[in-house]
Amino acid sequence: SKIEAGAIDLTMGWVDVPQLCREVIATFSHKKRDDAVELRFDESSPQIVINADKNRIIQVLSNFLTNALKFTTKGSITLSYTLEDESLVRFCVTDTGKGIPDEQQHEIFNRFIKLDSFVQGAGLGLSICQSLVKRMGGEIGVESREGEGSCFWFTHPYVSGTFL
């Protein structure tokens, strides 16, 4: 695909990170299936702006949140971000879902990988996210414990001094 070949154009601009996160959570609050899952944004995250492709950031976060909603039947899903070394923003979607077995975590970003054949989807979402994140100069990963939940994360370059 164009994304995997690095042939996709990025439309860069200044992005108010907390505002973007609030917008994404508001959108997903309307898509939530039941009230047993709380969807929230961690408001303790710092007020920053980044030079990024807003739509691509939303695309990755939306994929993470869609997956979290599929696999979390009760508890919470939290969108947060942190500054790392004043040069990276680390976005994270943490859920209290069923988690991913250790032996399957390394495969999850491969194309056509679906860990649950009963769940709708082609198994391309995380592979596309990985390509987009790499194209934007970041890294992507997951930290998960089976039966406890997962944290899907990605990093994006940050230039210090761009606080709001």
Where are these regions (language model features)?
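Short conserved segment of the HATPase_c
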Residues: 100-112, 152
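Helix-loop junction within the histidine kinase core
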Residues: 1-12
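Short alpha-helical Gxxx[C/S/T] motif in the catalytic ATP-binding
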Residues: 125, 129
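Short helix-loop "hinge" at the ATP-lid/N-box region of the Bergerat-fold HATPase_c
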Residues: 68-69
